[in-house]
Structures are given as structure tokens and as C-alpha cells.
Swiss-Prot record:
Pfam families: BAR (PF03114), SH3_9 (PF14604)
Residue spans of biased composition, Polar residues class: 390-402
Disordered, as annotated region: 302-321, 329-414
Record carries keyword Thylakoid: no
Gene Ontology MF terms: lipid binding; membrane bending activity
Subcellular location: Cytoplasm
Protein name as annotated: Uncharacterized protein C19C2.10
Lineage: Eukaryota, Fungi, Dikarya, Ascomycota, Taphrinomycotina
Length: 501
């Protein structure tokens, strides 16, 4: 008890600056101890950082459909190999994916070998060195305790008034134990310093293994380059789409035929325009007049329908060949972004004259019928014009339409409900680009009043403005591009409010 109290008193006096005698050590010993402490701190940091490095490199994760866990680089290689094998029958470049995938898998095996060396050799030697330094710390604490006992007894003897043989004997024993532990501690520090070449050799072997790992990885990647991996690859041999129209007249240039991936459009507008001097219309057969009656609608569209159907058949055949050549990975080229235009029932209602159009609320059923009729193909253009003029003698003048706003025209009749109550209002679900002068250019969301249903594929209607009034823009549009207008639609409600007041 007295010995522990004396040791505590000695330690307190040294810490708080009391007059206590303390045994001093040599400069060589202090220098060696400082170097040993630096080694202990450094080796501990190296061990913790290398452990974290190996743990990150050795992370193995499995995909959702795989039970075995692999390195990320091995997963990458396996994915490339699977892609190449899947495209082996449909792509000439499948071997490229397989070559790169196998190289990545081999790099994964090299990484596993490198990590095995880190775990079994480098980190093992590092842990042994760290254990030796930590064992030295135990010897240091033992030496420090004996020093405190020795210094406490020395201070006690100096303060004693008379000599005591027992105190002197305890002092000699404490001195011997302190010198013994001091010698052991110093010898162990010297031994650890002599083992420094072994620690350096461990780092050199780590460097050599790193060079070996990266050199083999580089050789694998360069081997791909030497085998022509980096050369420019040819495009996949996809059969090109070619289109040919049946019986195209000589007066129509090839630039008037435009082919697109989703449809084929024959641009006939320039050839159907009237000649300014002779006032005659040129058509593929030189017999089609400028106006067409509804009775001969099917006869007039036979030639255009045949050409369009023939072109679409060629296009569908080419798309089918392309899909067969690409296998399962071919892109579905026949899927349009909007519904297909019903070309097989599309009437050819082309006209080159700007004719004033009544608002839908002022048009009678007779006007709508006459505006979309077609004469016989055997009749001459002049005779057909005279016939249509006699039938359409009730057409208003342009000034009567442009001077008065549509809202006032609606109110000039006592009961507009009788003319529009039997018709329906639709909203465009897709945008529509016209191909002839008789078709309306419409955007998604436009509201139209249906004037006439020509057939199941094409309707005639008048576009409504945002405030619900008639715009005077009348023409054809595909019926599968629109849906019935909702009763709570803002424009529809404005139209009903203006139309039924």
C-alpha cells in the first residue's frame, strides 16, 4: 500500500510541477524511442488504410438473377460475353463483344490473384510488425511503473532524518528492477529497428505484384488492339428501303416523290396547278378536272390508291426483311408515333382556286354536299366548271364573309340550333400535316365541328377558334386522329354558348 501511494505521489508531483526527483534518460535512448513511436503510429495507419483498400477491391456483388457473387469487373466481362453470344447469329460484330468480355473476365481473375497476395502476404507481414510494436508498448509501461517506484523511494530517503536500512534495501531492489526493464525495452527497440529491411522488402514485393497485375492487364488490352479490335467496324448490312410507284407520268419529276420511314407522299401540287395563260390543269392523265363530284369519288382515287398501296407494300416488305436480318434485336420500324392515315379510302379533293367558305353555322346541307362532289372523269374541265357553277349559285361573296365577324353572322339567323344541333364536335388527339390543298393543317388539341362524314376514314369539318367561334377554315381530316370533345372543355363550352344563344 505504501509502495503504491509513493508511486502515485511521485507521478502527481511530476505532472503538476512539484519538487520531485525524476530519473533522466540518455539522448540516444530518447532518439530511439521517438523513432519507435513514429513507426508505431505509421504502421497502424498503413494497416487500417490497406485493410480498407483490400475490402473495397474485394467487394463481390451478385445480380438479381444470379446467386454467385463476382467482382464488378468480372460482371462487366460476363455481360459483354452474353451480349456477343446473343448476337452471334444476327450481327457481324458479335465477336468484338465476346473478345472484350473475355479480356475483362481475365482481368478479374488477375485482380483476384492480386488480392490474395495482399491478404495472405502483405497484410499478414504488416500485422506481424504491428503486433511487435504493440508488444513493445507493454514493455514501456512496465519500465515506466518501475521508474516511478524507484524515484519515489529515492525522494523518501532524501527526506528521511536518519538512515534506515530497510529503505535502502527497497531502493536497491527498485533500482535493479528498473534497470532490468529499461534494458529489455531498449534491446527490443533496437531489434525492431534492425528488422526495418524486412519491412521495406515487404513494400518492394507489393510494388512488384502491382506491376505484374497492371502489366498483365495492359497486355490483355493491347492484345485486343493488335487483333484489330480498334479498327473501324462496318455497319450492319441492313437492306435499304427502295420505293417505286406504278405508272408515274413523265411530266412529274422525281423530286416530287418524297419517301419517309413511316409513309410515302406523292407531291403532286406543282403539276396540278393551273397554267396562267391557258387556264388548264395538268394531271397525270390530263383528264382530271379541278373539281370532283361525290358520285365518282371512288373512281377518281383508284390510281392514287394503287400507287400508295404498292409503295406501302414495298416498304412493309423491306421492313420485314430488315427485321429478319437483325433477329430479335431489330427495332420495330413500323410503329408510328400517331395512327396511320387511312390512305386506301382517302378522296382526292384537290382544287387550285381560293373559294370563299361559309362558316359552318351558315352552311346548309346542300352547300356541304356540293363542296365535296366530283364530276365524271370523261367530262371536260369547262363543262364540269359550268355544271358546278350552276349547282353552287348560292355561294356567298368574299366580302360578305370578311366584313362581319363570325359571332355576328351567327346572330343574324333566328335559329342556328337547327343547323348545328345534328353535328358533333371533336378534338384532335394528334397533329396532322396536310398533303393536299383540301386537307386542314391541325395541331393536337384543336377543336372542329364535323360537317360531313365522307367515309369511315375521312371527315369534313370546320376549325373552331379558342373563343369558340368559327374560323372559316374548312377541309378534310382523318377521323382516327380525333376524339369526341368533352362537355366541360373550355372551347367547347364557349362554342355552345355562342352557337345556341
Amino acid at each position: 500500500m505504501n509502495k503504491h501511494f509513493a508511486k502515485l505521489s511521485q507521478w502527481t508531483g511530476e505532472k503538476f510541477g512539484f519538487d520531485r526527483q525524476k530519473t533522466t534518460l540518455s539522448d540516444d535512448f530518447c532518439s530511439l524511442k521517438g523513432e519507435t513511436d513514429a513507426w508505431l503510429v505509421g504502421m497502424d495507419k498503413i494497416h487500417r488504410s490497406c485493410t480498407r483498400w483490400v475490402r473495397n477491391m474485394d467487394k463481390r456483388k451478385g445480380l438479381l438473377d444470379e446467386k454467385d457473387k463476382q467482382l464488378p469487373v468480372t460482371h462487366v466481362g460476363s455481360s459483354f460475353v452474353e451480349l456477343g453470344q446473343a448476337l452471334s447469329h444476327s450481327s457481324s460484330n458479335s465477336h468484338t463483344y465476346i473478345m472484350y468480355g473475355k479480356s475483362m473476365v481475365e482481368i478479374g481473375h488477375l485482380q483476384e490473384e492480386f488480392m490474395d497476395y495482399l491478404n495472405n502476404s502483405f497484410l499478414a507481414n504488416l500485422e506481424n510488425s504491428l503486433a511487435e510494436f504493440k508488444a513493445l508498448d507493454v514493455k514501456e509501461k512496465k519500465m515506466e511503473n518501475r521508474r516511478l517506484v524507484f524515484d519515489a523511494l529515492s525522494t523518501k530517503i532524501q527526506k528521511a532524518k536518519k538512515e534506515e536500512s530497510k529503505l535502502e534495501e527497497d531502493l536497491r531492489n527498485a533500482r535493479a528492477k528498473y534497470e532490468e526493464s529499461l534494458e529489455e525495452f531498449e534491446d527490443r527497440m533496437v531489434q525492431l529497428k534492425e528488422l526495418e529491411p524486412d519491412r521495406v522488402e515487404n513494400v518492394v514485393r507489393l510494388l512488384q505484384m502491382q506491376i505484374r497485375f497492371h502489366q498483365k492487364s495492359l497486355d490483355l488490352l493491347k492484345g485486343l488492339e493488335m487483333n484489330g479490335f480498334s479498327k473501324k467496324r462496318d455497319n450492319v448490312n441492313i437492306p435499304k428501303r427502295t420505293y417505286s410507284a406504278r405508272s408515274i407520268p413523265s411530266n412529274i419529276s422525281s423530286t416530287n416523290v418524297a419517301t419517309t420511314p413511316s409513309n410515302t407522299i406523292f407531291e403532286m401540287d406543282d403539276t396540278l396547278k393551273a397554267d396562267s395563260s391557258s387556264n388548264e390543269y395538268h394531271s397525270p392523265t390530263n383528264t382530271l378536272p379541278s373539281y370532283h363530284t361525290e358520285a365518282d369519288l371512288d373512281n377518281s382515287s383508284i390510281a392514287s390508291s394503287n400507287r400508295t398501296q404498292h409503295t406501302e407494300d414495298n416498304y412493309n416488305k423491306d421492313v420485314s426483311d430488315a427485321q429478319n436480318s437483325l433477329g430479335q434485336s431489330a427495332v420495330d420500324l413500323t410503329t408510328p408515333s400517331s395512327p396511320p392515315i387511312p390512305r386506301h379510302t382517302k378522296p382526292k379533293l384537290s382544287t387550285t382556286q381560293s373559294t370563299p367558305v361559309k362558316p359552318a353555322s351558315l352552311q346548309s346541307e346542300e352547300d356541304i354536299q356540293l363542296s365535296f362532289k366530283q364530276p365524271e372523269l370523261s367530262a371536260s374541265s369547262a363543262e364540269l366548271d359550268e355544271k358546278l357553277k350552276s349547282q353552287c349559285n348560292v355561294s356567298p361573296s368574299p366580302s360578305n364573309i370578311s366584313d362581319a365577324p363570325p359571332s355576328k353572322l351567327n346572330r343574324s339567323y333566328s335559329s342556328p340550333l337547327a343547323s348545328i344541333s345534328s353535328r358533333k364536335v371533336v378534338r384532335m388527339k394528334y397533329s396532322f400535316e396536310p398533303e393536299t390543298e383540301n386537307e386542314l393543317k391541325l395541331k393536337k388539341g384543336d377543336l372542329l365541328l364535323v360537317l360531313k362524314e365522307i367515309d369511315e376514314g375521312w371527315w369534313v369539318g370546320e376549325k373552331l377558334g379558342e373563343d369558340g367561334v368559327f374560323t372559316g377554315n374548312t377541309g378534310m381530316f382523318p377521323s382516327n386522329y380525333c376524339v369526341p370533345a368533352h362537355p366541360w372543355d373550355k372551347t367547347f363550352r364557349a362554342f355552345l354558348k355562342k352557337g345556341f344563344k
